[in-house]
């Protein structure tokens, strides 16, 4: 597969894909915006604490690989970045809105069940039911230009198998989780996290509006 992203590259691209949909008024993102998005505590696994220089290094590498492009010029005092990873004018990778939502959530959080993905991707795309989530995952797993996701072996006590993206190479199944409480509470945790994401983004928008009013 021609797409081979490191963990940090996957985080940066996932953040840009997410913000392009959820906060379009703040997109493209500056370096500081990307740092904030990479290090935010909601909808991220693992939570990171990247420095500006670390993020800048990833941005430079991704620009060289044509996965991102810089936006500058009249009206832009600082360089900003937008993704060319998918659905760009000259790129080969074309994804539907549902596919973008799932891929983004997998890039940001790693392996997840369809139920977790539906809750956590809700800010990007509203799936009508679980069947739509599962059919979209199957499409991503069986695309001629893919596969882009893989279904992992079901863990003991879990009702659903987890899926993982393949943009960082082949995936080895992680050791099985035996904590039954984790299995039972997974969907509830995902719904709580989705609400936390929504609150954080509303706060971010409010802060941005207040900053503009103060100018």
From Swiss-Prot:
**This protein's record includes keyword Acetylation:** yes
Determine the domain of life of the protein's source.
Bacteria
Post-translational modification N6-acetyllysine, affected residues: 80
- Keyword Acetylation belongs to the record: yes
Note the SS bond partners. none
Sorted alphabetically, the keyword list is: Acetylation
Please give the InterPro entries that the UniProt record associates with this protein: DUF480, WH-like_DNA-bd_sf, WH_DNA-bd_sf
Against HAMAP family, the record matches this protein to: UPF0502
Question: What NCBIfam families does the entry give?
Answer: PRK11239.1 (NF008413)
Family annotation (PANTHER family): UPF0502 PROTEIN YCEH
What protein family is recorded? Answer: Belongs to the UPF0502 family.
* UniProt-recorded name of the protein: UPF0502 protein YceH
Recorded source organism is Escherichia coli O7:K1 (strain IAI39 / ExPEC)
């Amino acid at each position: 597969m021609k797409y081979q992203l490191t963990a940090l590259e996957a985080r940066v691209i996932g953040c840009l894909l997410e913000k392009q949909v959820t906060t379009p008024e703040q997109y493209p993102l500056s370096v500081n915006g990307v740092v904030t998005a990479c290090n935010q505590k909601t909808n991220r696994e693992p939570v990171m604490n990247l420095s500006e220089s670390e993020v800048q290094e990833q941005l430079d590498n991704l620009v060289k690989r044509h996965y991102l492009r810089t936006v500058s010029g009249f009206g832009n005092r600082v360089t900003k970045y937008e993704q060319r990873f998918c659905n760009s004018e000259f790129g080969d990778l074309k994804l539907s809105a549902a596919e973008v939502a799932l891929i983004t959530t997998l890039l940001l959080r790693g392996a997840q069940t369809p139920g977790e993905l539906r809750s956590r991707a809700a800010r990007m795309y509203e799936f009508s039911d679980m069947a739509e989530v599962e059919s979209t995952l199957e499409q991503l797993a069986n695309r001629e230009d893919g596969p882009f996701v893989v279904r992992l072996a079901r863990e003991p006590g879990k009702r659903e198998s987890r899926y993982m993206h393949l943009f960082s190479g082949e995936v080895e199944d992680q050791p099985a989780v035996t904590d039954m409480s984790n299995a039972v509470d997974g969907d509830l945790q995902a719904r709580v996290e989705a609400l936390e994401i929504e609150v954080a983004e509303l706060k971010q928008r409010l802060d941005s509006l207040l900053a503009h009013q103060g100018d």
